[in-house]
Amino acid sequence: MFKGIVEGIGIIEKIDIYTDLDKYAIRFPENMLNGIKKESSIMFNGCFLTVTSVNSNIVWFDIFEKEARKLDTFREYKVGDRVNLGTFPKFGAASGGHILSARISCVASIIEIIENEDYQQMWIQIPENFTEFLIDKDYIAVDGISLTIDTIKNNQFFISLPLKIAQNTNMKWRKKGDKVNVELSNKINANQCW
């Protein structure tokens, strides 16, 4: 379980594509390197991954399952992209946010971004077959960020992220049309990334 709070922003340094797996090299921020080692559990844009190796500040992950690559946003990533990172909370630590399984329910599309002095707001559209799982004022996670659904319209939902928080996540670089990972408040989890 993860906290739904972004602890740092990683940068994709390298992607190696193979027949049965993809290998991702992520440059980690200095504040997250302490304690990161092989087999550490990491939240990567809302998806649970296991570290395969660490070389200085470069952390490697393997994405094995073809279905995982098909269902989440891994197929969208390119070198230079920024990703949200989080770690498994230590026993007894305050969680904040809401507890996430880091199992992606579906991939959604950003259809509108509205920014003002205090908030970054978005309309996000999920696949129609997940509409029934949207609950007004319920928790939802977008790329691993714990949020509350403000409004629902058909298969779209509206969220407001305080600007000071948005500036410390990959949402700072998001634009209309981008794909994001969504976890639907533990009501349904269709996929797990390893």
Curated annotation (Swiss-Prot):
<keyword id="KW-0288">FMN</keyword>
<dbReference type="GO" id="GO:0009231">
    <property type="term" value="P:riboflavin biosynthetic process"/>
</dbReference>
<dbReference type="InterPro" id="IPR017938">
    <property type="entry name" value="Riboflavin_synthase-like_b-brl"/>
</dbReference>
<dbReference type="Pfam" id="PF00677">
    <property type="entry name" value="Lum_binding"/>
</dbReference>
<dbReference type="InterPro" id="IPR026017">
    <property type="entry name" value="Lumazine-bd_dom"/>
</dbReference>
<comment type="subunit">
    <text>Homodimer.</text>
</comment>
<dbReference type="InterPro" id="IPR001783">
    <property type="entry name" value="Lumazine-bd"/>
</dbReference>
<keyword id="KW-0285">Flavoprotein</keyword>
<feature type="repeat" description="Lumazine-binding 1">
    <location>
        <begin position="1"/>
        <end position="98"/>
    </location>
</feature>
<feature type="binding site">
    <location>
        <begin position="179"/>
        <end position="183"/>
    </location>
    <ligand>
        <name>FMN</name>
    </ligand>
</feature>
<dbReference type="GO" id="GO:0004746">
    <property type="term" value="F:riboflavin synthase activity"/>
</dbReference>
<protein>
    <recommendedName>
        <fullName>Yellow fluorescent protein</fullName>
    </recommendedName>
</protein>
<keyword id="KW-0455">Luminescence</keyword>
<dbReference type="InterPro" id="IPR023366">
    <property type="entry name" value="ATP_synth_asu-like_sf"/>
</dbReference>
<dbReference type="GO" id="GO:0008218">
    <property type="term" value="P:bioluminescence"/>
</dbReference>
<feature type="repeat" description="Lumazine-binding 2">
    <location>
        <begin position="99"/>
        <end position="194"/>
    </location>
</feature>
<keyword id="KW-0677">Repeat</keyword>
<comment type="function">
    <text>Antenna protein that modulates the color of the bioluminescence emission of the luciferase. In the presence of YFP and only at temperatures below 20 degrees Celsius, luciferase exhibits a bimodal emission spectrum with a new peak at 545 nM (yellow), in addition to the one at 485 nM.</text>
</comment>
